[in-house]
């Protein structure tokens, strides 16, 4: 988030795709409403909570109509309510998601496949339940 307002941040991608301004505005409004921060569109990102910033960042991706969503520790620094709300948003996202996380509960709720990496090497590639139920494997790799 680097623009003066959330609206401008969310519009950045579609504008750089050279979409018509009416389409840009439509995508921005839809993305902001989808993540529940339409009322913040004219606010500076520098004055938002962590949860609001995460929602704004997600809106920037949604406005691009991305087919794959890559997330790095999406629930970090969120309070319990913000975490639940973000997970609900991600569950509703109908596209492929690649999530890097240490939040094992997030894996259980959100993922259909789990890949465990250690020192850049794949040590497991399985269903989330199978991975999360293997306590010896998790402990051996620092989880």
Which residue stretches match the model-derived regions?
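Catalytic Walker B motif of ABC-type/P-loop ATPase nucleotide-binding domains
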Residues: 69-72
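Conserved ABC ATPase "signature" region
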Residues: 22-40
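H-loop/switch region of ABC-family ATPase nucleotide-binding domains
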Residues: 101-102
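Conserved beta-strand-loop-alpha-helix hinge in the C-terminal portion
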Residues: 121-142
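Hydrophobic anchor residue at the start of the ABC signature
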Residues: 58, 86
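A short, surface-exposed alpha-helical micro-motif characterized by mixed small hydrophobic
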Residues: 107-109
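Conserved ABC ATPase signature
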Residues: 44-48, 52
């Amino acid at each position: 988030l680097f623009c003066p307002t959330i609206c401008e941040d969310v519009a950045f991608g579609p504008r750089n795709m050279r979409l018509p301004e009416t389409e840009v505005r439509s995508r921005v409004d839809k993305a902001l409403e989808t993540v529940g921060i339409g009322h913040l569109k004219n606010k500076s990102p520098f004055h938002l909570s962590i949860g609001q910033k995460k929602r704004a960042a997600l809106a920037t991706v949604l406005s691009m109509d991305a087919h794959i969503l890559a997330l790095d520790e999406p629930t970090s620094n969120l309070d319990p309510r913000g975490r639940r709300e973000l997970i609900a948003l991600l569950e509703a996202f109908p596209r492929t998601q690649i999530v890097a996380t240490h939040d094992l509960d997030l894996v259980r709720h959100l993922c259909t496949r789990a890949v465990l990496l250690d020192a850049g090497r794949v040590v497991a590639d399985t269903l989330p339940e199978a991975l999360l139920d293997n306590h010896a494997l998790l402990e051996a790799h620092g989880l």
